[in-house]
Amino acid sequence: MPHAKFSRVKITEPVLTASEYSLRTSSYIERWQKQHGKRLDHDERVRKRQARESHKQSQDAQNLRGLRAKLYQQKRHAEKIQMRKRIKAQEEKNVKSSAPDEPSKTPLPQYLLDRSQATNAKALSSAIKDKRAEKAAKFAVPLPKVKGISEEEMFKVVNTGKKTHKKSWKRMITKPTFVGSDFTRRPVKYERFIRPMGLRYKKANVTHPELGVTVQLPILGVKKNPQNPLYTQLGVLTKGTIIEVNVSELGLVTTSGKVVWGKYAQITNTPENDGTVNAVLLV
């Protein structure tokens, strides 16, 4: 008896899109929970897992190294930005509007008139903003931004050592500096930063912006160097540095009639190139 020939039938799977595939594969947990229910301690386990999250984040932030640390910090940075935005939106939502949509037509008694339009929060917020703007204008400087200076440009390595000269922990400052009259040098063996005598300045050519006069005034100190707090401590004079000068020669007085002795000024030139310190008085 001849064998019967059977034709093969090819069964094809239905073609799924990426979204349908992800939905079908990602909802298996929910499907299983609907069929069989949850553990009795499921909620407690979830609560404890969430409580441990902050500890794990702290541990990762301290212990991750290299590229993983960089990626983790970027992720945390984005999360914090979103959190701040949500908090800010919530705070703005809670602030009562200064202008109500429609004034109430029903008359109010005398003791409730001050509560009809709650503008306290808005008024307080605007007052704080105005104060900040005034403060920013008060401390505005002629040069708000300056070019950065690298440590290689600022410091020159000084090799020391009795015979080998292999020790290189000392640094010589290559920029002009201000050293106060009461400064006492440390013993040479322990002096880390060397400020050459030829680059020390004691006077500055200060211009008064309103009077339009330039006077040579003694420098009292360095208030802030925009490059680095260390440069402020060392008294380095670079472009944009805020210095304190003795303005008693100008005869400036306060509203109460007292003579102004010290005032801040900002260096506007490059002292290492010009050989002199030019500054504008901050009034």
Swiss-Prot record:
Q: Give the compositionally biased regions (Basic residues).
A: 73-87
According to the record's subunit comment, the protein's assembly and interactions are: Component of the pre-66S ribosomal particle. Interacts with nop7 and rrp1. Interacts with rsa4 (via WD repeats).
Q: Which keywords does UniProt give here?
A: Nucleus, Ribonucleoprotein, Ribosome biogenesis, rRNA processing
Q: What is its main location?
A: nucleus
Alphabetical GO CC annotations of the entry are: nucleolus; preribosome, large subunit precursor
Q: Which domain of life is it from?
A: Eukaryota
| Nuclear localization signal 2 (motif): residue ranges | 74-81
One Pfam family cited in the UniProt record for this chain: Ribosomal_S8e
Q: Where is this region: Disordered?
A: 31-109
Family the UniProt entry places it in: Belongs to the eukaryotic ribosomal protein eS8 family. Ribosome biogenesis protein NSA2 subfamily.
Q: Name one GO biological process term.
A: maturation of 5.8S rRNA
Localization of this protein:
Nucleus, Nucleolus
- Motif segment (Nuclear localization signal 1): 37-44
Function as written in the Swiss-Prot or TrEMBL entry: Involved in the biogenesis of the 60S ribosomal subunit. May play a part in the quality control of pre-60S particles.
- Organism equals Aspergillus fumigatus (strain ATCC MYA-4609 / CBS 101355 / FGSC A1100 / Af293) (Neosartorya fumigata)
Q: Where is the composition biased (Basic and acidic residues)?
A: 38-58
Name used for this protein in its record: Ribosome biogenesis protein nsa2
Stored CDD domains: NSA2
